[in-house]
Amino acid sequence: MAIIQSSAYEPLTEQKATALAVRLGLFRDGTPLLCREIGDGNLNLVFHVVDQETKQGIIIKQALPYAKVVGESWPLTLKRAVIESNALRTFASYVPQYVPKVYYSDESLAITVMEDLSYLQIARKGLIEGKTYPLLSRHIGEFIAKTAFYTSDFGMNQQEKKKLAQSFVNPELCKITEDLVFTDPFFDHDSNNFEDELHLDVETLWNDDRLHLEAAKLKRKFLTEADVLLHGDLHTGSIFASDDETKVIDPEFAFYGPIGFDLGHFIANLLLNALSRPESERRPLFDHIDRTWAVFTSVFSELWRTESVETYAATPGLLDDVLRQTFIDAVGFAGCEVIRRTIGLAHVADLDGIEQKDERLAAKRHALRLGRRLIVERAELDGTEDFRRLFVETER
């Protein structure tokens, strides 16, 4: 790994990104390089540097000190770049096949240089196009199971876990989730964003005391339960995929939180894609939900039985209790994410990309009804087949 002297923060340009790649020695001397800024996210600059002869490339990602979606009036910590690079390295120690390689990071410049995954496609885009990604849910189920187990009190020494958790204290980005996922959509807040035609539907949510109580319970879990190292923002836009490969990216929201959170986020985004499809094309999404949970429980359970360091792990019923609570939490977190992505600050192309306005509004009303029931009825769901049942029951 190359080492260069850090300097004071300044935003990169394509020219500076190219110079950095050369200084790091990641390409042969004299290689003709092409650099393009490709970032389309809200929080970062992303540059793709490619050797024009071999077509081999790297990605240079730099955190911005503000959210692009809002501007400099919304300052953000640059520490999230360190969180991201450390999370990728931590995940790589357990599931290297599911994350990009990190070549270099610079804390003061808020830069991470990593493997080029441009030969893959962002899963959200592919799902919108109708791709099925047959191994996506198997890979994500394994990713979540292994990263959760090995960073939990069951998979690592408890004192070492506490030290690791300290290195992933991430208050600024957790605050974004606390507000945009668990709070703002349930109240009349300026950050919310929805069509005028949905106002009556949204007001119903704002005045729903039962929904508020259950959302508050889920927010409390997010705030207080430091179970495992989470990706923190595991939606289909944070995953590169092909028919046989899956890579998880962008863990700048990583922190120690409740086991079910990443599961719920991923499931929610599968549901959001299903909401955008006609009935005849939804089955692959529900199959993915089934497999995600099945693989997660299988892998997590096997690790529990064979590698747990917790004395109580052999106690009959404890694993079942952990898995049951994880499922209930995942259902509730999925409901919060579905509602947030429908009426909150950051929408998804799955719903917003529906061309016919009437169909788009119908899908969003469906999303609000589904999200509500996932939250308030989460403890009543017995398994992933109940996602199908609630989906159908809330369609009209």
Swiss-Prot record:
Class of this enzyme: transferase
Entry EC no(s): 2.7.1.100
Pathway(s): Amino-acid biosynthesis; L-methionine biosynthesis via salvage pathway; S-methyl-5-thio-alpha-D-ribose 1-phosphate from S-methyl-5'-thioadenosine (hydrolase route): step 2/2
Catalytic reactions of this protein: 5-(methylsulfanyl)-D-ribose + ATP = 5-(methylsulfanyl)-alpha-D-ribose 1-phosphate + ADP + H(+)
Record's keyword annotation contains Hydrolase: no
GO BP annotations, alphabetical order: L-methionine salvage from methylthioadenosine
UniProt: substrate binding residues: 233, 340
Binding site residues for ATP: 44, 61, 115-117, 250-252
UniProt entry tagged with the keyword Kinase: yes
GO molecular function term, any single one: S-methyl-5-thioribose kinase activity
Keywords: Amino-acid biosynthesis, ATP-binding, Kinase, Methionine biosynthesis, Nucleotide-binding, Transferase
Pfam families registered for this protein in UniProt: APH
Record InterPro entries: Aminoglycoside_PTrfase, Kinase-like_dom_sf, Methylthioribose_kinase
Similarity comment: family membership: Belongs to the methylthioribose kinase family.
Assembly description: Homodimer.
Record function comment: Catalyzes the phosphorylation of methylthioribose into methylthioribose-1-phosphate.
The protein's name: Methylthioribose kinase
Taxonomic source organism: Geobacillus thermodenitrificans (strain NG80-2)
